[in-house]
Amino acid sequence: MKNLTPDELYKIIGQNVAKYRKEKGLSQLDLSLAMGYKSVSVVSGAEIYYNGKHFNIEHLLKISQILNIEISEFLKP
């Protein structure tokens, strides 16, 4: 993997979360509710890295458990 900036890595992670979420047939709202949020703002913003919003390690751990995938899958370009 080339040297990535944090911004590039956050974008890759967001794209991968969106990809795996869609593969599992979940909407942003479904994922948000499963993570314990009442709205899609965290998921929708972080998936597209809107205004610097990104997933933190706790988010990624929860998402990997919900989607039943390895957390490392989110880091693959």
List where the protein language model places each region.
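Short C-terminal boundary/hinge segments that cap the last helix of small helical domains
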Residues: 57, 68-77
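Short, basic-rich loop-to-helix N-cap that marks the start of a DNA-contacting helix
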Residues: 49-65
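Recognition helix of helix-turn-helix/homeodomain-like DNA-binding domains
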Residues: 37-53
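The alpha-helix within a helix-turn-helix
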Residues: 21, 32, 64
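Conserved hydrophobic/aromatic packing and binding residues within compact polymer-binding modules
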Residues: 17, 31-32, 42-46, 74
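A short, Lys/Arg-rich alpha-helix, primarily the initiator
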Residues: 1-24
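Residues within the helices of the helix-turn-helix
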Residues: 18, 29, 61
